[in-house]
UniProtKB/Swiss-Prot annotation:
Family according to the record: Belongs to the delta endotoxin family.
Protein name: Pesticidal crystal protein Cry1Bc
A Pfam family reported for this protein in Swiss-Prot or TrEMBL: Endotoxin_C
Gene (UniProt): cry1Bc
More info: Toxic segment of the protein is located in the N-terminus.
Role noted for this protein: Promotes colloidosmotic lysis by binding to the midgut epithelial cells of insects.
Keyword flag Iron-sulfur: no
Statement: the UniProt record of this protein carries the keyword Coiled coil: no
GO biological process annotation, one example: symbiont-mediated killing of host cell
Keywords: Sporulation, Toxin, Virulence
Length: 1233
């Protein structure tokens, strides 16, 4: 790699073999320090083609710069950072995005499709233009934040760019191509999260609404998890796919692990620190993971000499190399002393090599005890061992020669020379290099410079200042004729001293502890933590961290912990052995679950403390659990004066919770505190930060739960949370023909409602279940919900209040009914103007509502001056309605009915948190008023009782007259349809059978009404059974009738009449009969105009009889009509009638499904005077109660004849000579003996 970095130690001829007499001499190398080797040809840049230094350089540079701008950076820092970022990812030269893609393709030997490549590169080019435009606008605005135009431009460009990158991300995770696209995806995801952070930093200043700022923040949190999981998943997939069996496959495997750690996982580890609400000031993060540069062994052998490459020289297997090189999870440590042992490979005096065959490495955790590891041959002292000192030194660069010697025909691979460039980070003037050097005259040499694989973060400063990694450990690959050292490295951000600096949040991974206590293990990190983590399964201490306090000791701090746990537990902390914090922390995952991003939570203690010594020991432990799993990623030290949004949230929540209770009694709920308000306070508490105030949150939750229990206790409603709605029957089922006993006294228990009323799970507005009432297409069939408060729940002379929360409504009617009806019609506009009748809940099985996001509530506090019976244009979402109760009587059990009703097509309502509670005792004028109301009601009830007695007697006599006896199982022979209708009308004149406000609710006279109505239903059924003519009352239109010409069926209330408007029309039906039996043909009809109406019965051409109808008025005024009825026997069909000819009941059930074409209007025989009580008249009584309905309208005549058929089939034919013939019913009744 050609580099222009300013390196004072740069070696001009890096491949020469040093001939320094003292192999451990520290060398102050300069450009003049040149040592030549005439035997070997240097091949400096001949690295494997799939190793792209440019890719690694960009990844390291970006991660390094991000580490400097975590939290809330200064404006100047951020402007400079974005300028750097745009320059790195969209420079003037070759596109780095293409390099990212090609590099991973070469590592895994899989190429993306041409379409994927072209689409991704083109989209990234567009994003580059957008970012450059945004960066320029940001710099302009930062120079003058008060300039309105600059503010408008930056906001416009921000919104456009954020949307663009949001839609672009999916293009970088194409199915089956996720791994080669991974580095592109990670860099793009990083750009998106940094951009989302800007909304939190500047959104308010740009003029964003707080809800918009919060929305961007919530997206940042959501995408952080999504992007992290994707990167870790496909990193692991790609790495596992490269797992092989031989040394060459391990080399590629390790390169993937190293380069994608630098380009992907390092970024992922920093994503959580972009959260400005958790990190509102500058934040120092640390990466403790280890990566491994390539083994120091020849890889560039010329053609024909491939066996001299180390991985072809009888190298160990993949698994053997991995076991020798990859360190098990461990505490972070630093090397202090390296002793290298050598051996000799000699073919002749001109071809020989002394080389590295083993080593002993001393290393130490921060503040911990010294540890030693040995690898290879360490007992050969024939060649003096070389000892190199690294204490307090960062080895930021290694240069190593891979040599090769030929012994007979067997190549020997070894390292005869290595130089370790170092600097003391605590004293920058202490820098230099220490060298291992042995004689070498082999057949080839290859230089390995660690900066080729781990370049500095910038080329603008010397590498001893800008280095990105430091040497942490050394492994050794051992074969029969192979020794290949492998250097491992940690990121420079993981400092040696655990220093807590001023004015910043300091993150310290717990693997930087000086020791591990009994029961603690270090486990491999899940990929997004930036290093290994600690685990305990039982109570005890994790470890001790030696801290260097670089701030005044008066500075106070709070501690936070990033952890994962399968159980609730307590964490405790100690400083120099003194306990400073103990707190409860909640479970974050289930036992057996994999460690995922969401498994970890950052939570802390609210009590601040200060350090007593500049050198202090911090201890973290856990207790109150056993046989569970607790993982610790890091601890964070936060200056106590740092104000978090979480603090404001806690303060607001505390005030809100305390405001639920009275000032004199903190265990008594305020009267004006609604159930809905308690739920909202509960949401407020639930949204508090676990990281900041877990203990306070739990305490507040207990108080809110207690308030909720008090609210439930005072609420007289049954099932206020809408777990079930009983008896959801449609109005058709309570028609005059229904089975009324299906609605009985059980209606006093819980909620009852119509079929279209639905229970919905909680949403962003309601914490618990709520109900929706849609519109209806017929106001006589409303959608409704009701409940009765029993008399036993009420106190005498007390005012009660119904209240609840209405999310939105239109034409919602609310009733409270006792002596009379208190009524209110309510319109409450919501966030949507209207919602579909069939709208379903947006809450899915896997999706929970976000109640922590701020919601814009439409007109939440609109006052309404409406009074009873008036209709408001707009109401408050908080609805209340009062009712006064006088004397109570458990035997009478009057109670209070609560009714919610929608009777318009455009009507709708969403409501919940309903309460019915005692408001106050009645005194003074209120008491006198309720007594007057109660007396009036009792007087009217007495009058109703007397009236009911009279009406019931008349109705019962009329009903009884229809039947042969009191068994009510046989009709009188002369009982016809008109008589049944007449009796039914009398039955329906019984008032107070059902509430006029909602006729599904039984009234005081329901029992006697249902008794008589049951007999009426029996009469209709018996009538249908004895009439041989199918559909003789035309309730089912013309079903079962044969028709020629034009005829109509007209409807008047519940009556259906056949209208024959012209002489050429014909209506007929074939009827099955019993030969030899006698029948009565009975017809009720009306004739308009001239001519005759004829109903004929016959068998083929013989045995014919007829009934003739004339207009009575015409008979008196006009000359007699000479026309006679004709027999319509020709061409009559023999259409059969089966089950399609329904009963009269079926006709009534479908009454409103027939659009009869009425051409005749007539006055009823008599008018009924309708009764109006203290409640308003319910005009829907027409649909079910026969008000103003005439069983036999004026002008209709009933005629009959006897007929004795001789065959099993007769024909009944209807026709006329002229004018209009109207037939109400046709009956063919079997004579009784």
């Amino acid at each position: 790699m050609t580099s222009n970095r300013k390196n004072e130690n740069e070696i001009i001829n890096a491949l020469s073999i040093p001939t320094v007499s003292n192999p451990s001499t520290q060398m102050n190398l300069s450009p003049d320090a040149r040592i030549e080797d005439s035997l070997c040809v240097a091949e400096v840049n001949n690295i494997d083609p799939f190793v792209s230094a440019s890719t690694v350089q960009t990844g390291i540079n970006i991660a390094g710069r991000i580490l400097g701008v975590l939290g809330v950076p200064f404006a100047g820092q951020l402007a400079s950072f974005y300028s750097f970022l745009v320059g790195e990812l969209w420079p003037s030269g070759r596109d780095p995005w293409e390099i990212f893609l090609e590099h991973v393709e070469q590592l895994i030997r899989q190429q993306v499709t041409e379409n994927t490549r072209n689409t991704a590169i083109a989209r990234l080019e567009g994003l580059g233009r957008g970012y450059r435009s945004y960066q320029q606008a940001l710099e302009t605005w930062l120079d003058n934040r008060n300039d309105a135009r600059s503010r408008s431009i930056i906001l416009e460009r921000y919104v456009a760019l954020e949307l663009d990158i949001t839609t672009a991300i999916p293009l970088f995770r194409i199915r089956n191509e996720e791994v080669p696209l991974l580095m592109v995806y990670a860099q793009a995801a990083n750009l998106h999260l940094l951009l989302l952070r800007d909304a939190s930093l500047f959104g308010s200043e740009w003029g964003m609404a707080s809800s918009d700022v919060n929305q961007y923040y919530q997206e940042q949190i959501r995408y952080t998890e999504e992007y992290s999981n994707h990167c870790v998943q496909w990193y692991n997939t790609g790495l596992n796919n490269l797992r092989g069996t031989n040394a060459e496959s391990w080399l590629r495997y390790n390169q993937f692990r190293r380069d994608l750690t630098l380009g992907v996982l390092d970024l992922v580890a920093l994503f959580p620190s972009y959260d400005t609400r958790t990190y509102p000031i500058n934040t120092s993060a640390q990466l403790t993971r280890e990566i491994y540069t390539d083994p120091i062994g020849r890889t560039n052998a010329p053609s024909g000499f491939a066996s001299t490459n180390w991985f072809n020289n009888n190298a160990p297997s993949f698994s053997a190399i991995e076991a020798a090189i990859f360190r098990p999870p461990h505490l972070l440590d630093f090397p202090e002393q390296l002793t290298i042992y050598s051996a000799s490979s000699r073919w002749s005096s001109t071809q020989h090599m002394n080389y590295w065959v083993g080593h002993r490495l001393n290393f130490r955790p921060i503040g911990g005890t010294l540890n030693t590891s040995t690898q290879g041959l360490t007992n050969n002292t024939s060649i003096n061992p070389v000892t190199l000192q690294f204490t307090s030194r960062d080895v930021y660069r290694t240069e190593s020669n891979a040599g090769t010697n030929i012994l007979f025909t067997t190549p020997v691979n070894g390292v005869p020379w290595a130089r370790f460039n170092f600097i003391n980070p605590q004293n920058i003037y202490e820098r230099g290099a220490t060298t291992y050097s042995q004689p070498y005259q082999g057949v080839g040499i290859q230089l390995f410079d660690s900066e080729t694989e781990l370049p500095p973060e910038t080329t603008e400063r010397p590498n001893y200042e800008s280095y990105s990694h430091r040497l942490s450990h050394i492994g050794l690959i051992i074969g029969n004729t192979l020794r290949a050292p492998v250097y491992s490295w940690t990121h420079r951000s993981a400092d040696r001293t655990n220093t807590i600096g001023p004015n910043r949040i300091t993150q310290i991974p717990l693997v930087k502890a000086l020791n591990l206590h009994s029961g603690v293990t270090v486990v491999g990190g899940p990929g997004f933590t930036g290093g290994d983590i600690l685990r305990r399964t039982n109570t005890g201490t994790f470890g001790d961290i030696r801290l260097n306090i670089n701030v005044p000791l008066s500075q106070r701090y709070r501690v936070r912990i990033r952890y994962a746990s399968t159980t609730d537990l307590q964490f405790f902390t100690r400083i120099n052995g003194t306990t400073v914090n103990i707190g409860n922390f909640s479970r974050t995952m289930n036992r057996g679950d994999n460690l995922e991003y969401r498994s970890f939570r950052t939570a802390g203690f609210s009590t601040p403390f200060n350090f007593l010594n500049a050198q202090s020991t911090f201890t973290l432990g856990a207790q109150s659990f056993s046989n569970q799993e607790v993982y610790i990623d890091r601890v964070e030290f936060v200056p106590a004066e740092v104000t978090f949004e979480a603090e404001y949230d806690l303060e607001r929540a505390q005030k809100a919770v305390n405001a639920l209770f009275t000032s004199t009694n903190p265990r008594r709920l305020k009267t004006d505190v609604t159930d809905y308000h308690i739920d909202q306070v509960s949401n407020m508490v639930a949204c508090l930060s676990d990281e900041f105030c877990l203990d306070e949150k739990r305490e507040l939750f207990e108080k809110v739960k207690y308030a909720k229990r008090l609210s439930d206790e005072r609420n007289l409603l049954q099932d206020p949370n809408f777990t079930f709605i009983s008896g959801q029957l449609s109005f058709a089922s309570i028609d005059g023909q229904s089975n009324f006993p299906s609605i009985n006294e059980l209606s006093e228990h819980g909620w009852w409602g119509s079929a279209n009323v639905t229970i919905q799970e909680g949403n962003d507005v309601f914490k618990e279940n709520y109900v929706t009432l849609p519109g209806t297409f017929n106001e006589c069939y409303p959608n409704y919900l009701y409940q009765k408060i029993g008399e036993s729940e009420l106190k005498a002379y007390t005012r009660y209040q119904l209240r609840g929360y209405i999310e939105n409504s239109q034409d919602l009617e609310i009733y409270l009914i006792r002596y009379n009806a208190k009524h209110e019609a309510i319109n409450v506009p919501g966030t949507e103007s209207i919602w579909s009748i069939s709208a379903e809940s947006t809450i899915g099985k896997c999706t929970e509502p976000n109640r922590c996001a701020p919601h814009y509530e439409w007109n939440p506090d609109l006052d309404c001056s409406c009074r009873d019976g008036e209709k408001c244009a707009h109401h408050s979402h908080h609805s209340t309605l009062d009712i006064d109760v006088g004397c109570t009587d458990l035997h009478e059990n009057l109670g209070v009915w609560l009714i919610f009703k929608i009777k318009t097509q455009d009507g709708h309502a969403r409501l919940g948190n309903l309460e019915y509670l005692e408001e106050k005792p009645l005194l003074g004028e209120a008491l006198r008023r309720v007594k007057r109301t109660e007396k009036k009601w009792r007087d009217k009830r007495e009058k109703l009782h007397l009236e009911t007695k009279r009406v019931y007697t008349e109705a019962k006599e009329s009903v009884d007259a229809l039947f042969v006896d009191s068994q009510y199982d046989r009709l009188q022979a002369n009982s016809n349809i008109g008589m049944i209708h007449a009796a039914d009308k009398l039955v329906h004149s019984i008032r107070e059978a059902y509430l006029s406000e909602l006729p599904v609710i039984r009234g005081v006279n329901a029992d006697i009404f249902e008794e008589l109505e049951g007999h009426i239903l029996t009469a209709f059924s018996l009538y249908d059974a004895r009439n041989a003519v199918k559909n003789g009352d035309f309730n089912n239109g013309l079903t079962c009738w044969n028709v020629k010409g034009h005829v109509d069926v007209q409807q008047s209330h519940h009556r259906f009449d056949l209208v024959v408007p012209e002489w050429k029309a014909e209506v007929s039906q074939a009827v099955r009969v019993c030969p030899g039996c006698g029948y009565i043909l009975r017809v009720t009809a009306y004739k308009e105009g001239y001519g005759e109406g004829c109903v004929t019965i016959h068998e083929i051409e013989e045995n014919t009889d007829e009934l003739n109808f004339k207009n009575r008025v015409e008979e008196e005024i006009y000359p007699p009509d000479t026309g006679t009825c004709k027999y319509y026997t020709e061409n009559q069909g023999t259409r059969t009638c089966g089950n399609e000819c329904g009963s009269r009941n079926e006709g009534y059930d479908n009454a409103y499904e027939i659009n009869a074409k009425s051409s005749l209007e007539y006055r009823p025989t008599y008018e009924e005077e309708t009764y109006t009580d203290v409640r308003r008249e319910n005009h829907c009584e027409y649909a079910r109660g026969y008000i103003n309905y005439s069983p036999v309208p004026a002008g209709y005549v009933t005629k009959e004849l006897e007929y004795f058929p001789e065959t099993d089939t007769v024909w009944i034919e209807i026709g006329e000579t002229e004018g209009k013939f109207i037939v109400d019913s046709v009956e063919l009744l079997l004579m009784e003996e």
